[in-house]
UniProtKB/Swiss-Prot annotation:
The modification Phosphoserine is found at S26. Signal peptide: none annotated. Keywords: Acetylation, Membrane, Phosphoprotein, Sugar transport, Transmembrane, Transmembrane helix, Transport. This is D-xylose-proton symporter-like 2. PANTHER family: D-XYLOSE-PROTON SYMPORTER-LIKE 2. It is found in: Membrane. It comes from Arabidopsis thaliana.
């Protein structure tokens, strides 16, 4: 709603005092971005809940991946499925598996249109509601068609949660631990996968076990929804609305101060107002007072942010991650580590490895920085992919080569692309672009995931596994070049400093 002149006046005052209105950065303003920051006092305990409830969206996403791998087995059991339509074709099973992916693609498109209107908090509340509805519809499905509808609804919530959770965590976390907290969301995704595999292995031989697998999401969705209802709105989203002339200026500013006090704990109360003024100044300084149009998404620093964020999540998928994990059970079975009937236990083993390596990344990411982990981890992925390709081409009599390559790939991925891809897209976009830009990045992520997943089998038949994995290795080398020349280091910078210095 448009503001009257009295309401708009404080906006122009902020612009005159702290920044530019024409898009030109004057030299005398530079110290504002470089050094004159209010110390970020915060309570680690107070920072936990603003991370935990959004991260449950990632946990529910990961749980769905793990549980579905076991649910498809339960669904097709004549004696244990508890349904008359258990005789599913490969296409039917494929739709059960990929239904949430289609929903996530649609959810990313929805997020593009609503993110900056309703804000991160309300988007996460909506995601929790759809998680709840999707889980209930899936678990109680009387027919195959209803099951697919439930899977798609659940997928829409995945798209919304994977869009809003990184933004909310990045915008509310103190800068010194922002990298750790956003990366912990990836830890929660992997934790959810391990939980899904675990619940699945426990209920796969239970009558109607697939219903229990999907119903387990219900209490988690309720907790997420209640938690997000209790948490405040993102202070940076509130301040963006202030400088863009949306809503009552003083009310929004006071709400931002209260939000920061709630998010940072009692230690922050005395400096909250000063921190809000500093954020307002920096947002105006870097030109956030002008709302971005669709065309401007592909110009200037907005385009650079899209290239960095979109490129990272694209390489995250097209370097073979979905395919390698898909092929993992057969690799371990070939090596004699598991019988075919123990596929779920194999998945749990890999999930635990992913969990451990993600934990390592979380611990060191704000010490070592983003670029060293990306370059080192992706470098290890290059070695592992060529090693895996060589196994199928030259060393098929030595399955230990494949096992070493597989474990190296999983470990290096979780040190690099796994957590840092989501972290960088939550940091790199300017605030006025963050909602739409991150939705495009999430769309690229799920779209590339779908493309690689569906193209893997025909490409394997056409080229053979050895050449295919070597091809992924070549793409991985290209991603190293991209990271080295394009991706900036954001360690220790505030979100406003990232926009001013890196774009």
């Amino acid at each position: 709603m448009a503001l009257d002149p009295e309401q708009q006046q404080p906006i122009s005052s902020v612009s005159r005092e702290f920044g530019k209105s024409s898009g030109e950065i004057s030299p005398e303003r530079e110290p504002l971005i470089k050094e004159n920051h209010v110390p970020e006092n915060y309570s680690v305990v107070a920072a936990i809940l603003p991370f935990l409830f959004p991260a449950l969206g990632g946990l529910l996403y990961g749980y769905e991946i793990g549980a579905t791998s076991c649910a498809t087995i339960s669904l097709q059991s004549p004696s244990l499925s508890g349904i008359s339509w258990y005789n599913l074709s490969s296409v039917d099973v494929g739709l059960v598996t990929s239904g949430s992916l289609y929903g996530a693609l649609f959810g990313s498109i929805v997020a593009f249109t609503i993110a900056d209107v309703i804000g991160r908090r309300k988007e996460l509340i909506l995601a929790a509601l759809l998680y709840l509805v999707g889980a209930l519809v899936t678990a109680l499905a009387p027919t195959y068609s209803v099951l697919i509808i439930g899977r798609v609804i659940y997928g829409v919530s995945v798209g919304l949660a994977m869009h809003a959770a990184p933004m909310y965590i990045a915008e509310t976390a103190p800068s010194p631990i922002r990298g750790q907290l956003v990366s912990l969301k990836e830890f929660f995704i992997v934790l959810g996968m391990v939980g899904g595999y675990g619940i699945g292995s426990l209920t796969v031989n239970v009558h109607s076990g697939w219903r229990y697998m999907y119903a387990t999401s219900v209490p988690l969705a309720v907790i997420m929804g209640i938690g997000m209802w209790w948490l405040p709105a993102s202070p940076r989203w509130l301040l963006l609305r202030v400088i863009q002339g949306k809503g009552n200026v003083e009310n929004q500013r006071e709400a931002a101060i209260k939000s920061l006090c709630c998010l940072r704990g009692p230690a922050f109360v005395d400096s909250a107002a000063e921190q809000v003024n500093e954020i307002l100044a920096e947002l105006t300084f870097v030109g956030e007072d002008k709302e971005v149009t669709f065309g401007e998404l592909f110009q200037g620093k907005c385009l650079k942010a899209l290239i960095i964020g979109g490129g990272l999540v694209l390489f995250q998928q097209i370097t073979g991650q979905p395919s390698v994990l898909y092929y993992a059970p057969s690799i371990l079975q070939t090596a004699g580590f598991s019988a075919a009937g123990d596929a779920t236990r194999v998945s749990i083993l890999l999930g635990l490895l992913k969990l451990i390596m993600t934990g390592v990344a979380v611990v060191v990411i704000d010490r070592l920085g983003r670029r060293p982990l990306l370059l080192g981890g992706v470098g290890g992925m290059v070695v592992s992919l060529f090693l895996l390709g060589s196994y199928y081409l030259f060393f098929s009599a030595s399955p230990v080569v494949a096992v070493v390559a597989l474990l190296l790939y999983v470990g290096c991925y979780q040190l690099s692309f796994g957590p840092i891809g989501w972290l960088m897209i939550s940091e790199i976009f300017p605030l006025k672009l963050r909602g739409r830009g991150l939705s495009l990045a999430v769309l690229v992520n799920f779209g590339a995931n779908a493309l690689v997943t569906f193209a893997f089998s025909p490409l394997k038949e056409l080229l053979g596994a050895g050449i295919l994995f070597c091809g992924f290795g070549v793409i991985c080398v290209l991603s190293l070049v991209f990271i080295f020349f394009i991706v900036p280091e954001t360690k220790g910078l505030t979100l406003e400093e990232i926009e001013a210095k890196c774009l």
